[in-house]
């Protein structure tokens, strides 16, 4: 029997506000443990929460960018459960009246566009963080409450995803949108973008959902894809063996490449939701919604279309460049100085991204300013350096932080375009390779490429390749 996966994602994005959701404590990452806390976020008696208006603003931007219907009336609720990192023993969240519902997001996998439904977008606060310590006589855990009360948006998809690759594409697209909106830094390694996956399998063609498990602890796009691949295979193996999938919360173990049972999956009633008595409901008028809509920035899909329409870039190239706001901004700044967009795209898609990935850097961390890359391309265009040398110069720019012209001058990399000087070297190469010359004259076109290579080798790659070709053909 052939099975298909049914996947829905619950994504938590920490918002880039200066203060927490319901108090004035800092949201800065990396502070000393338990220094960004106050009686409100610790849940001490005698204090009341106050909603941070920017949290609502960021929620509206996200909801509109995801094509959701914003509720004119919503409220907060208490989600009750007991865990050491939750000092109040409840989390302020939204239950039956969330901020927004009924949106969608478009993804593209293997050239196929799919529309993934967004069930809801709601606001809530984050919990603290447990730090597990191994010590003599047994381990113990410490609690850091700095993250407690940091504002989150939870974005819940419909169970419309049908493969781990689609789930990864969805997460990557969602991260891009959040970064374009500038509402979250989306640093998965710091926990500011987290994802839980609800996954089940069913016979292909069936409309009935199978028993789902929830998979947690996936802190990268690669981990998300690997965890889902394993969990889907695990569930199929159980069903094919005549067993039954048990509803549970699973943890992804990255080092072992397996999912393991954390606990039996809770139902909504286990959390005993009830309206938050210390916060009044929110009424969001149409004027506020329309102002936020007008102020939305150019989003990834629109920017991708602009690069295709304005510069004639292929859909794939435009999609890669606009998948990151920082990378798209970098491209625009290079093109502003060097207007051949296709050349810029080729360099960014090739050597630039290769060097970034080799150093595990994001586009916003590139050590080469866009103006310097434009300068490098100008040096190549004007014939000062060859394409091969330009690639070497870019590598040194990444390594040293120096500008292109400085490197070219210091290392004496200026392209040789002197006809007399090159002619002498060409003559020497022809004299040293009579058999190759004979091959070319007998119709073997590849022989010319060998001779060009020998001239380039003799000049340390500094010869003007166009002039070398011209001189060789004249002599042959």
From Swiss-Prot:
Keywords: ATP-binding, Ligase, Nucleotide-binding, Protein biosynthesis. Pfam families: GatB_N, GatB_Yqey. It is an enzyme of class 6 (ligase). It catalyses: L-glutamyl-tRNA(Gln) + L-glutamine + ATP + H2O = L-glutaminyl-tRNA(Gln) + L-glutamate + ADP + phosphate + H(+); L-aspartyl-tRNA(Asn) + L-glutamine + ATP + H2O = L-asparaginyl-tRNA(Asn) + L-glutamate + ADP + phosphate + 2 H(+). It comes from the Bacteria. One of its GO terms (molecular function) is asparaginyl-tRNA synthase (glutamine-hydrolyzing) activity. Belongs to the GatB/GatE family. GatB subfamily. This is Aspartyl/glutamyl-tRNA(Asn/Gln) amidotransferase subunit B. The lineage of its organism: Bacteria, Bacillati, Bacillota, Clostridia, Moorellales.
């Amino acid at each position: 029997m052939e099975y298909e996966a049914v996947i829905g994602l619950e994504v938590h994005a920490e918002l880039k506000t200066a203060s927490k959701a319901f108090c004035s404590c800092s949201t800065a990452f990396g502070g000393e443990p338990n220094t960004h806390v106050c009686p409100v976020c610790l849940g001490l008696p005698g204090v009341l929460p106050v909603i941070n208006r920017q949290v609502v603003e960021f929620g509206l931007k996200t909801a509109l960018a995801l094509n959701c219907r914003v509720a004119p009336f919503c409220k907060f609720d208490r989600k009750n459960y007991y865990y050491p990192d939750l000092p109040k023993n409840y989390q302020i969240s939204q239950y039956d009246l969330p901020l927004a519902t009924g949106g969608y997001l478009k993804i593209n996998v293997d050239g196929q566009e799919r529309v993934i439904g967004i069930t809801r977008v709601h606001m809530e606060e984050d919990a603290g963080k447990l730090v597990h310590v191994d010590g003599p006589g047994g381990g113990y855990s410490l609690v850091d409450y700095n993250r407690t009360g940091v504002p989150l948006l939870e974005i819940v998809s419909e169970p419309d995803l049908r493969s781990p690759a689609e789930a990864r594409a969805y997460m990557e697209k969602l991260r891009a949108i959040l970064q374009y909106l500038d509402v979250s830094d989306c640093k998965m390694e710091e926990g500011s973008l987290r994802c839980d996956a609800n996954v089940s399998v069913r016979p292909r063609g069936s409309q009935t959902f199978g028993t789902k498990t929830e998979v947690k602890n996936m802190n990268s796009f690669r981990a998300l894809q690997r965890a889902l691949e394993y969990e889907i295979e695990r569930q199929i193996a159980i069903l094919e063996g005549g067993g039954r999938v048990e509803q549970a919360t699973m943890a992804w173990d990255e080092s072992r490449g397996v999912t393991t049972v954390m606990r039996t999956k809770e139902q909504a009633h286990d959390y005993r939701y009830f309206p938050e008595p210390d916060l009044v409901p929110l009424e969001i008028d149409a004027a506020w919604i329309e102002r936020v809509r007008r102020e939305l920035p150019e989003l990834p899909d629109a920017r991708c279309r602009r690069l295709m329409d304005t510069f004639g870039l292929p859909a794939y190239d435009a999609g890669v460049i606009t998948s990151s706001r920082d990378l798209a901004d970098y491209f625009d700044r290079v093109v502003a100085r060097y207007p051949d967009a296709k050349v810029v795209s080729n360099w960014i898609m090739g050597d630039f991204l290769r060097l970034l990935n080799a150093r595990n850097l994001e586009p916003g961390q590139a050590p080469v300013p866009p103006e310097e890359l434009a300068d490098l391309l100008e040096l190549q265009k004007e014939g000062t350096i060859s394409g091969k040398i330009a690639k070497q110069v870019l590598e040194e720019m990444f390594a040293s932080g120096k500008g292109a012209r400085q490197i070219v001058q210091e290392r004496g990399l200026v392209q040789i375009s002197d006809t007399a000087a090159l002619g002498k070297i060409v003559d020497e190469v022809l004299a040293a390779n009579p058999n190759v010359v004979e091959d070319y004259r007998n119709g073997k076109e590849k022989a010319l490429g060998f001779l060009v290579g020998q001239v380039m080798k003799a000049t340390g790659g500094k010869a003007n390749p166009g002039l070398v070709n011209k001189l060789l053909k004249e002599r042959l």
